[in-house]
């Protein structure tokens, strides 16, 4: 059986934590931020943990892990 490939988009966008959760960056931070208030920009800084419903699918696309 051939080796399974990791989806390249998943490699770029997600990281696995030590406990098995999936971290991702928050969307909507690239441009046109002048129309958002400071609280929106501040709270969407950094990364967040992916929802449990989506975690299984991301792990399917990365069969050998992400780190």
Curated annotation (Swiss-Prot):
For this protein, the record's SUPFAM superfamilies field holds: L35p-like
Keywords assigned: Ribonucleoprotein, Ribosomal protein
Top-level taxon: Bacteria
Residue ranges that the Swiss-Prot or TrEMBL entry lists as coiled coil: none
- Kindly indicate whether the keyword Ribosomal protein belongs to this entry: yes
A GO cellular component annotated for this chain's UniProt record is: cytosolic large ribosomal subunit
Which GO BP annotation is one of this protein's? translation
Q: Does the keyword Ribonucleoprotein apply?
A: yes
Q: List the disulfide bonds.
A: none
What Gene3D superfamilies does the record point to?
4.10.410.60
Output the InterPro entries linked to this UniProt entry: Ribosomal_bL35, Ribosomal_bL35-like, Ribosomal_bL35_CS, Ribosomal_bL35_sf
Q: Kindly list the GO molecular function terms attached to this UniProt entry.
A: structural constituent of ribosome
NCBIfam families tied to this protein = rpmI_bact
PANTHER family from the xrefs? 54S RIBOSOMAL PROTEIN BL35M, LARGE RIBOSOMAL SUBUNIT PROTEIN BL35M
Which family does this protein fall into? Answer: Belongs to the bacterial ribosomal protein bL35 family.
According to UniProt, the name of this protein is Large ribosomal subunit protein bL35
């Amino acid at each position: 059986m051939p080796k399974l490939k990791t989806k390249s988009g998943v490699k770029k966008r997600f990281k696995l934590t030590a406990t098995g959760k999936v971290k991702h960056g928050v969307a909507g931070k690239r441009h046109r931020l002048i129309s958002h208030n400071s609280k929106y920009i501040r709270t969407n800084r950094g990364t967040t943990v992916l929802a449990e419903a989506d975690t299984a699918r991301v792990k399917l696309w990365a069969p050998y892990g992400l780190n």
